[in-house]
UniProtKB/Swiss-Prot annotation:
This is Glutathione peroxidase 1. Its main location: cytoplasm. It is an enzyme of class 1 (oxidoreductase). It comes from Callithrix jacchus (White-tufted-ear marmoset). The record marks 47 as: Subject to oxidation and hydroselenide loss to dehydroalanine. Homotetramer. Interacts with MIEN1. The modification N6-succinyllysine is found at residues 86, 112, 146. GO terms for cellular component: cytosol; mitochondrion. Its EC number is 1.11.1.9, 1.11.1.12. The modification Phosphoserine is found at residues 32, 195, 199. GO terms for biological process: arachidonate metabolic process; glutathione metabolic process; hydrogen peroxide catabolic process; lipoxygenase pathway; response to hydrogen peroxide; response to selenium ion. Keywords: Acetylation, Cytoplasm, Lipid metabolism, Mitochondrion, Oxidoreductase, Peroxidase, Phosphoprotein, Selenocysteine. It catalyses: 2 glutathione + H2O2 = glutathione disulfide + 2 H2O; a hydroperoxy polyunsaturated fatty acid + 2 glutathione = a hydroxy polyunsaturated fatty acid + glutathione disulfide + H2O; tert-butyl hydroperoxide + 2 glutathione = tert-butanol + glutathione disulfide + H2O; cumene hydroperoxide + 2 glutathione = 2-phenylpropan-2-ol + glutathione disulfide + H2O.
Length: 201
């Protein structure tokens, strides 16, 4: 196990973790989302796919939120330094630059943090240990080694912005998707998950 995963090794589900929303306030315990299907993505506001990916993240939250889906975004600057804004600047960047046009995320957006390396948020250390590679691209790696800005480097690292993790209502990670697998294409998996009903009584 990579050292970054040791802190999260004892966890059985994502409900063991918490994070602070971008808007501030007290940390949100993911345990408060028990019995929901979760779609977790690492995001960046200056990526070449920011417009597509952020707008696609709004769609499942809008359509499937009433049925029990919660979409969570975690800004990170690891991949190409494409989230170099401060926490207080990110929402304005999304609203006026990319995607722009007054865009506002309708999903939970958390404070900027790390998804790889020794400083990785324990949630992402847990997700990476539970699902070591994207299901659609088991060989996914950072394309350009010069862009690796964290240490230690592990085989299960998140390779780029907008990797996705689908988590069941029991808090157990089910599937990981690469940056190339669009959020909109995950909807059949989400629909199938939600149609099973809660399994976390």
């Amino acid at each position: 196990m990579c050292a970054a995963g040791l802190a999260a090794a004892a966890a059985q589900s994502v409900y063991a973790f918490s994070a602070r929303q971008l808007a501030g306030g007290e940390p949100v315990s993911l345990g408060s989302l028990r019995c929901k299907g979760l779609l977790i993505e690492n995001v960046a506001s200056l990526u070449g796919t920011t417009v597509r990916d952020y707008t696609q993240m709004n769609e499942p939250q809008r359509r499937l939120g009433p049925r029990g889906l919660v979409v969570l975004g975690f800004p990170c600057n690891h991949s190409g330094h494409q989230e170099n804004a401060k926490n207080e600047e990110i929402l304005n960047s999304l609203k006026y630059v990319r995607p722009g046009g007054g865009f506002e995320p309708n999903f939970m957006l958390f404070e900027k943090g790390e998804v790889n390396g020794a400083g990785a948020h324990t949630l992402f250390a847990f997700l990476r240990e539970a699902l070591p590679a994207p299901s659609d691209d088991a060989t996914a790696l950072m394309i350009d080694p010069k862009l690796i800005t964290w240490s230690p480097v592990c085989r299960n690292d998140v390779a780029w912005n907008f990797e996705k993790f689908l988590v069941g209502p029991d808090g157990v990670p089910l599937r990981r998707y690469s940056r190339r697998f669009q959020t909109i294409d995950i909807e059949p998996d989400i629909e199938a998950l939600l149609s099973q009903g809660p399994s976390c009584a």
